């Protein structure tokens, strides 16, 4: 189970860094080796855990979210100005830093749910 959780963690981070498709292709030999070896009895659940960790990683960074870069562009184009707090108004910028606060939380919640599910099922 710890090996599967480690593979899920690596898959989540890779999916965030290089996107879901390449991560699925790169990690598939590892998942198939686990399905043929120590986790053969749970191979169906292994595929679900693999997919869940790819989904979690897809939320992690702005560039790995499906519409992340488009959303950042649209927020800047909207020229949203935050409420007056005594400072001169500045248009709101939605980039990697602001997105990461939400993306990391969302990916963490998704990964935690997937890991808890793995611990219950396996």
Region locations from a protein language model:
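Membrane-interfacial helix-loop connectors
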Residues: 1-86
